[in-house]
């Protein structure tokens, strides 16, 4: 009997299985979910997760771009984990769901990385 490769444990996951995945705090409290991923066209690496909150903290109409390195997969919750408090989320750079973030503006991207204290995926700071 052939085994289904989707049920075998491994570290790779299809992008369509990441989109919609829950984002939780380390204690398991629900924050939101991953709306979509942003992938660097040249390197093929995931650069950002775009988070949706569905009305959480009054930021439901906005999406938050989060550097991918801020998330960790938590096998216990089968969700991505984000160690962030409510105030940090409220102040986080965001954009309206009906408009896209200006991905061509490196200064805005650099500001985003500074906010989260993470080096940009393209190098420098």
For every predicted segment, state its role.
Residues 1-125:
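Peripheral interaction segments used for macromolecular assembly
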């Amino acid at each position: 009997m052939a085994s289904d490769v989707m049920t075998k444990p491994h570290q790779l996951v299809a992008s369509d299985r990441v989109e919609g995945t829950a984002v939780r705090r380390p204690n398991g409290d629900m924050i939101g979910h991953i709306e979509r991923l942003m992938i660097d066209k040249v390197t093929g690496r995931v650069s950002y997760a775009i988070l949706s909150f569905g009305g959480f903290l009054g930021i439901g109409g906005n999406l938050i771009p989060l550097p991918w390195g801020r998330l960790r997969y938590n096998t216990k919750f089968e969700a991505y984990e984000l160690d962030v408090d409510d105030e940090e989320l409220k102040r986080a750079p965001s954009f309206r769901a009906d408009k896209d973030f200006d991905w061509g503006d490196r200064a805005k991207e650099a500001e985003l990385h500074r906010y989260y204290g993470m080096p940009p995926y393209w190098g420098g700071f």
